[in-house]
């Protein structure tokens, strides 16, 4: 009711004020209605229906009486509406039923139509794809038909192309290399034009396999005993195949020929070192020379006419061949040294001659390796000599362990009559016969002479110092063995045994050692040593003990055993003395000096190259005790 007050007209307000008040009143009415009917009519519901709002505004503008009658009026109007609706339903119920049935049927039909349309829409993509596939297959069939027609028309040409791999394989296996190379060139042209065609790719792959087989066959031919014309053809085929560069082709050629050479060398029997090395020398000399001749005929070591392109590097192709030749020579020297160390008997000079001839033949191709042979033979010669000397020392030590001075006394007692000395040739070295009274010394000298005889077969001047040092070491060990024997037996020596032992030491120092010194002078003449060093023979003494043994160093440990002499002979260590004469109570006046007794020679005249007695260059080393120039070595207790 309070909200209806502003709706009363005011006589004093103007028209503008009245309109404003009315608008404000409507707003206030809506707010009041919203608060009054909040529980029954939600605000959103009556705001969406204009009739409800209009009716409510109409009620808000009505008087009290009308508002009191409004519920009754609404009830009557409702009853009236219900009666009208009931009458309408009774009058038209068949229509309503028919309409409901039609509506239901229409609703059901629409559902069926909707389901059918859904199934149709689901099948349309598959149908569309099937149509596309049909069109595509039709196009493919059409294209295939056109291709089959074209293939039928070009059947002969296609068959020839398809038979290329079989024809290529036949040519390769029958060694028709020229025809195989022409087929390969034709296939390369096909590949450049039709590389995307699978059939062409298959043909190319099969032809490449045949080319690989042909490459293996050509390289295998180089691994056989092939002659120069065949080598030229094979290398020509390899160059036309364009598989290797020029440097790689040279390496392949040398590898193949090297494999053939190694197969020949491997087939040589290895049981006998001398037979193995002689056959190796012959095979290497003949076949290596052939390989070098073939290489130089096929490949040129001249500089290329055109400079290398930008970004390319040059290969020193000449170094490939020279490196291979050096490798082969190095391998030959290794085999030579191995067989020499295995032992070849007394045929070292013959083997040296063969090797020198081998090196000389290689000088014609610029690969003279004779300078490399000298160190090999020197090492083998000194090693063999050292081994023989060591064995001689060991045998001497073994004999001294069982040596007794009693047997020596019997020998000396029975040798009052002079022994018959065999006739010797002029200019030969006769071993001291006094050593026959002392079997250990005689056998030791025999073994050393056997070592000297073997050394004479190949005795370079460069070994003078090593041979001298080896002999000095051996004599030093012999001296120590004699001293050890003296220390062990001195306590039980009788006066006679002591005298015999003194004679034993005297024979060792004054007969055996000087004789070995003379042998060294025969092996290494002082004049030859001086000429090698580029000095005069008089200056040779400044270079130490070259070619002679230091007798003083060997004599010094035994000095306390030897009796003191009134005149002591001293070998000047700076001169080469051929011998120490046997001690005598007195010397002739002309020999009472400190100078060694030497033969009369002109100044600068070399010592004669005298062979040891009865020792020419033998094919086999002389046997111990039976060689000419050796002292017979009796057993202890045996009569000489």
Curated annotation (Swiss-Prot):
Localization annotation: Golgi apparatus membrane
Alphabetical keyword list: Golgi apparatus, Membrane, Protein transport, Transport
Top-level taxon of origin: Eukaryota
Name this protein carries in UniProt: Conserved oligomeric Golgi complex subunit 8
Gene name of the record: Cog8
InterPro entries: COG8 (IPR007255), COG8_Metazoal_Plant (IPR016632), Cullin_repeat-like_dom_sf (IPR016159)
Location (main, coarse): Golgi
Ligase in keyword set: no
Spans through the membrane: none
Family: Belongs to the COG8 family.
GO cellular component: Golgi membrane; Golgi transport complex
Subunit structure: Component of the conserved oligomeric Golgi complex which is composed of eight different subunits and is required for normal Golgi morphology and localization.
